Structures are given as structure tokens and as C-alpha cells.
Curated annotation (Swiss-Prot):
Protein name: Zygote arrest protein 1.S
Pfam families the record matches: Zn_ribbon_3CxxC
Taxonomic source organism: Xenopus laevis
Alphabetical UniProt keywords: Cytoplasm, Developmental protein, Differentiation, Metal-binding, Oogenesis, RNA-binding, Zinc, Zinc-finger
Entry-linked SMART domains: zf-3CxxC
Lineage of the species this protein comes from: Eukaryota, Metazoa, Chordata, Craniata, Vertebrata
Family per record: Belongs to the ZAR1 family.
Main location: cytoplasm
Result, substituting residue 247 to A: Abolished binding to the 3'-UTR of mRNAs
InterPro entries according to UniProt: Zar1, ZAR1/RTP1-5-like_Znf-3CxxC
Entry's Gene Ontology BP terms: negative regulation of translation; oocyte maturation; translation
Top-rank taxon: Eukaryota
Localisation: Cytoplasm, Cytoplasmic ribonucleoprotein granule
Length: 295
């Protein structure tokens, strides 16, 4: 058991100046070090709390399992000038240390791997490694793969002759086709544009049909931007039949066929009593725009 500990047993003010008030602003000046006063005060508070929880618990006298790490804020400034680790000083990094090494004399004329850093490295410590793994591009991997196939083909060409060359060409064609298939997936547009199409709706539950001459869809797709709601059951429907605004028979926006397949007047392209979703919106069905909107 530890004896009772008084949390206010730290060093007190020098009583030589009897007339000094405790509210004086420079009361910390009589201490030898302000940091010692703060450490003793915090240690006293911690020890008082630990004595209330469990008398056997006492704060450790020293830090355990700690490491000194220096952080350089400005990478352009010299590390030795900016900060230090006690007696140790941060090692200075040469300005040309991150540059790629020159190619060897015996190496073939192949594209070297480029090193790209996503952000500036500002931590200098013995734990952090000086070198970072380079980010390999897919194009470099494909070229290296082609070079490996060529080297294997050159060794096998001496034995098999023209048969090995044909296999190499087939392998290169397959790599090119794979690269072309992967290209459209990578180059997807960041923005999606809207276009207007003709939509035909039918609610099987209520047995109601309605048409819309101008339905806002995502460009080159049948994905409707504004859903249609039935006037009775209020169910949302995507048109199961979306076509171009132009008539398929006469190829005109305003149909002039004797037998009209579409019963929509372009002047009133949509029956608002059946669709209350887009009424009053900026992209309403009864408004026609000659330009595209970006989602």
C-alpha cells in the first residue's frame, strides 16, 4: 500500500516577496523551468487519479517503447537546418538522389521504368526507406511482355525456324487485341449527356397507356433520367420501349403518315395529367431544348 498522496505537494512559490499576489501574471518566473512545473503538476494530477482508482497503480518514471522521428515540413529547405533529433541531426539528401540511374552500357535500348511519386515525401527518419517502389504502367508491362516473347522466339527460332516466328506474331496480335479491348474501358467519359427520345408507357395493373414525344434519357442508352408515374396507382415505370423522336417510316419529327403509329402532338408532347413527375422542373417533358445538359 502506498501512503496517502497530496496532489498539491509540488513546489510552491518563493515566499520571499510577501506582498506578491497569486494573481500576478509572471508567477511562473520564480520557477527555474516552466516545463518542470507543468510536468510536476500533471504528474500530481495523474497520481491522484490513479490512487483513487487503485493504490497499486503509479505512473512510470520514463517513457517506454518510444521512437524519435523527425518531420521536415519544407522539402526544399535543408533538413539539417530545419530540424534535428536531439544530438543527432537529420541527414541531408542530395538533390539528385531521386533521379533515375543512367542505363547500363550492355542493356538493350528499351524504355526504362519511370518513377512517379503521388505526393512530396516530407518524412525523413531512419525507419522510412529512402527508395520507393516505382509505379509500373500497363504499357511498360505489355512492352516487356513482348520483349520476353521475342527473346523466347529468337532462341526457339534457331531450332524450329519459321514455326516459332508465326507463334510470336500470333502472340503479339493477341496482346494488341487485349490492349484495344481494355482501352475503351479506361477512357470512359467523366460526364454523361442527356438527349430526348420517344417513350411508350403501359401500366398493366390499371390498363392505362400513355406516350411521350420527348423523354430525357442518358445519351446512347435507354436509361431514363425522369421516371414516369401512373396517375392511378402511382407506380414508377421506365419505358420498355424507347425510340428516336423521328418517325421510323417517314423519317420526320412531325409524322405525316396516313396511319400514325404514334398519337402524340409535338406541340403538346406529353400528357401532364398522366405524368406529374417532371411538371414544373427545369427539364420538363413539355419543354424542348436544342442543347444538351450535363448530369
Amino acid at each position: 500500500m502506498y501512503p496517502a498522496y497530496n496532489p498539491y505537494s509540488y513546489r510552491y512559490l518563493n515566499p520571499r516577496n510577501k506582498g506578491m499576489s497569486w494573481r500576478q501574471k509572471n508567477y511562473l518566473a520564480s520557477y527555474g523551468d516552466t516545463g518542470d512545473y507543468c510536468d510536476n503538476y500533471q504528474r500530481a494530477q495523474l497520481k491522484a487519479i490513479l490512487s483513487q482508482v487503485n493504490p497499486n497503480l503509479t505512473p512510470r518514471l520514463c517513457r517506454a517503447n518510444t521512437r524519435d522521428v523527425g518531420v521536415q515540413v519544407n522539402p526544399r529547405q535543408d533538413a539539417s537546418v530545419q530540424c534535428s533529433l536531439g544530438p543527432r541531426t537529420l541527414l541531408r539528401r542530395r538533390p539528385g538522389a531521386l533521379r533515375k540511374p543512367p542505363p547500363e552500357q550492355g542493356s538493350p535500348a528499351s524504355p526504362t521504368k519511370t518513377v512517379r511519386f503521388p505526393r512530396t515525401i516530407a518524412v525523413y527518419s531512419p525507419v522510412a526507406a529512402g527508395r520507393l517502389a516505382p509505379f509500373q504502367d500497363e504499357g511498360v508491362n505489355l512492352e516487356e511482355k513482348g520483349e520476353a516473347v521475342r527473346s523466347e522466339g529468337s532462341e526457339g527460332g534457331r531450332q524450329e525456324g519459321k514455326q516459332g516466328d508465326g507463334e510470336i506474331k500470333e502472340q503479339m496480335k493477341m496482346d494488341k487485341t487485349d490492349e484495344e479491348e481494355a482501352a475503351p474501358a479506361q477512357t470512359r467519359p467523366k460526364f454523361q449527356f442527356l438527349e430526348q427520345k420517344y417513350g411508350y408507357y403501359h401500366c398493366k395493373d390499371c390498363n392505362i397507356r400513355w406516350e411521350s414525344a420527348y423523354v430525357w434519357c442518358v445519351q446512347e442508352t435507354n436509361k431514363v433520367y425522369f421516371k414516369q408515374f401512373c396517375r392511378t396507382c402511382q407506380k414508377s415505370y421506365n419505358p420498355y420501349r424507347v425510340e428516336d423522336i423521328m418517325c421510323q417510316s417517314c423519317k420526320q419529327t412531325r409524322c405525316a403518315c396516313p396511319v400514325k403509329l404514334r398519337h402524340v402532338d409535338p406541340k403538346r408532347p406529353h400528357r401532364q395529367d398522366l405524368c406529374g413527375r417532371c411538371k414544373g422542373k427545369r427539364l420538363s417533358c413539355d419543354s424542348t431544348f436544342s442543347f444538351k445538359y450535363i448530369i
